[in-house]
Amino acid sequence: MFSSTRRAEGPCATELTQVSSLLPPRGPYEFSLLPTLTRPLEDLSKCIEGARQTSATANGYSPTGLVPLADSILEICQAACTAYGLVDGAIAAGVGTGSSDNSPTATGIGAAGLTGDRPSSSGASTWRCVKTPMTLGSLTLQNEEESLLARQIVYAVLTSLSALLREVYVREKDVVSETDVVGEGGVGAGAALYGREGAGAVSQCLSRVLALLGKIVPE
């Protein structure tokens, strides 16, 4: 289970806890985890969107622990990308806080290894995606078909995660614009939407998510 140094507080703490409870400790995890993340991420995003109706401060839009949680999900997606060969291992490592690696599954289904494996920037172990059998009716998917489905699943998770972070970032920018005088050098609407120019933790995390998302757009 994902753990944070601080307990989730404020609006949407329940939804944040629901997402965090799905994440395993760092180490091997099964790919089947990823499809379970999409709906809870969407629920959290909807909750944060609704929080603007009752909260008058930027802190009300960003529950405690949101960015560490998002970074963890990003690393899990990076590990999945490496396992299924969706992106080059070095690329996956370069868009996040650390590299992801992979190990053979207990069932003997081979998984792509990561070259240049190294620990994450925090010094902790990384997540390693273990392939799980994928079926379509009675047909077991293999090779390109398997990778295609994996790509679609990872893409869905990253899309939900980016929508969540974008919602938080835009709401925070809205609050700041109402309380501060923005000069000619202020952040424009485009930067607010995509989080490329902001200096905050949310915008930086969003940029990392979008970087990986852009690498795995389904063909």
From Swiss-Prot:
Signal peptide: none annotated. Pathway: Polyketide biosynthesis. Induction: Expression is controlled by the asperlin biosynthesis cluster-specific transcription factor alnR. Residues 97-124 are annotated as: Disordered. Residues 105-116 have a biased composition (Low complexity). Disruption phenotype: Fully eliminates the production of asperlin. Part of the gene cluster that mediates the biosynthesis of asperlin, a polyketide showing anti-inflammatory, antitumor and antibiotic activities. The first step of the asperlin biosynthesis is the production of the intermediate 2,4,6-octatrienoic acid by the highly redusing polyketide synthase alnA with cleavage of the PKS product by the esterase alnB. 2,4,6-octatrienoic acid is further converted to asperlin via several steps involving the remaining enzymes from the cluster. This is Asperlin biosynthesis cluster protein I. It comes from Emericella nidulans (strain FGSC A4 / ATCC 38163 / CBS 112.46 / NRRL 194 / M139). The gene is alnI.
